[in-house]
Amino acid sequence: MDDLKNGALYIGTIPSSMDNNRCSVTLEDDGSVTFYIYAPNANKVEVAGMGGYFSSERIQLKPDMQGGFSANIKDFHWAMHYYFWYVDDVCITNPHAAISYGCFAAINTFEVPEEGEDFYFVRDVPHGTVSLCKYTSQVNGHIKESYVYTPPGYESGDGRYPVLYLQHGVGENETGWVWQGKMNFIMDNLIADKKCVPMIIVASSGYAFKDNEYPVFFPGDFDSELVNSIIPYIEENFKVKKGRNNRAVAGLSLGSGQATDIAARHPELFSAVGVFSGVAIHLMKKIIDSPYRFEAVFMSAGDEEKEILLGINEMVKEFSRQGKNSTPKVYEGYHEWHVWRKSFKDFAQMLFTWDDAELDDIDKAVPVRSKNIDFTTPVQADESMVFFDPVYRQIQFENDEDGKPAGKYPDVIHGIRVTEDNSIEVNLFAPDAKSVSVVLENGTEELLYRSKKNDGYWEKTIGNPAEGFNYVTFMVNGTPVVNPAAPVGFGYNRAVNFAEVPERNFSWHELKETDHGQIHIHYSCDGDGQVSMNYVYTPAGYGENNCDTGRVCVLECAADERNFCWIHQGKIANIMDNLSGEGRIKGIMIIMADSTISDDIIGNITAIYGIKDSAQKEWFKKGDNESWTSCRHRFVNFMCGIQ
């Protein structure tokens, strides 16, 4: 097993980076784990998990007398771990450690692989594509995003595919099944091993709150959003087989409850349902009583999820009593991602082995105008990798009078908010901190003060900030941290928060009501087993109606940033959508590159889309010390100039 190809360790939403020339988390050859942080102003540093295989009991790191702190932990149990750092008793998010979206926040993660299991590794097999697709929700008018996996060969072939709609758990979002779940790598490996039917997989954000809606356990009317917005979008924009025989729905935890509810409400639309760590197993009774035949009903849990297992056993007996089949599975583990990866792997192998007769049973999406969006709303300001269409909520677990889940989602305070007068309001929850400050992109340091209104928070309003994009570095007791309740990007060779201040005379980068293109993530392995991800933008309708011109523009990022920064900091997709929508440009593909991208990789990418090596290529590079605001302006002029 080659650890270099372990996507779980080396690929994350916001990747890890070197901290004082050391990794924040290192999996040693003997299976132990070493934690490290450079915090020269700290007196004490600790780490702790969330329970389960990584205890919530804090582990103290030892100072190395050179500003760093480290600890080596033996016999660390395999799993993907959410965890926390504590600097002088203040819980922080480490900007040099890998970050994903979980627990309604940017949260540090790392992985210890299970010996003998490589089903979720990045193997040297043909890789599918993950596409980021925007749609407008008919429920609340928000512009939202789905992550869509298409199998290897999808772009160049004429085949059509069945679709699995796959939902995340509470506190997570549409990014979870890719970055934490590794579902794309699992599918690549299953398809390469001929263990499953090639399929399209759609992962969407399950939060469908309306304005001023009282938020309860099932967050809004996601059922309607899936049926009336997401499925029509997928069937209009992807090569899919239609009809219930070619659709399945599944999810984990909260998502399992949503999947069960959706399948029970619409048995005419889905032929299979997967329930991973089912938190609303009682809804299965509606599926049991349905007159429609479900080809696969899969229920799973970790062996430490005792209450859920009791519910599964009860439902299995009920299915059997009525002469219907169901498949229960139990895996070693708690309520955590390794259980759900194995659940997904096993469920995927069951799917679409039956009659694939098609039926056009979904109406096309009715055009919906998104709400007027500006930079004072979270949807616009926080269009970042881990905060797209953010919820800004936490969860209070509760049960109703029948003992069924009925949790609430109270609002939380935004870490960064741009006010109506274009000031930046910053807030950080750090009740035990001695000092909190922010360092702006221009180098100015602003001290925060303890809030008189919100216990445990530090706050400040900063007037007259620079218009446009601003990096904001939060400091706790002199140590740089990530504010988990604010947008997160990547700069200065680490994760970093940012603020967007409206520009008076420039809006090409804003998220607007227009036809949206797609971002595609293409994966490759080099000869040393290193994995690279390359991001490609194609405009709306690319490949149809002579939209594509065969022209390519390659964007090269700054030395201390990564290629994905073009999406969330450069807002390249928004700029291209808006320029295309106004007829300024047409049919140009964008390849977002690191400084190390090779001509071979560029050639492989363009070949996927049928573009010849001889096609005209333009190059645009962000300066190493250039602000994103300046880069956006220059890029717009550049694109209009080459058209």
Regions found by a protein language model. Give the residues of each.
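Non-catalytic cap/lid and distal C-terminal segments of serine-dependent acyl enzymes
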Residues: 2-16, 20-58, 62-435, 439-445, ...
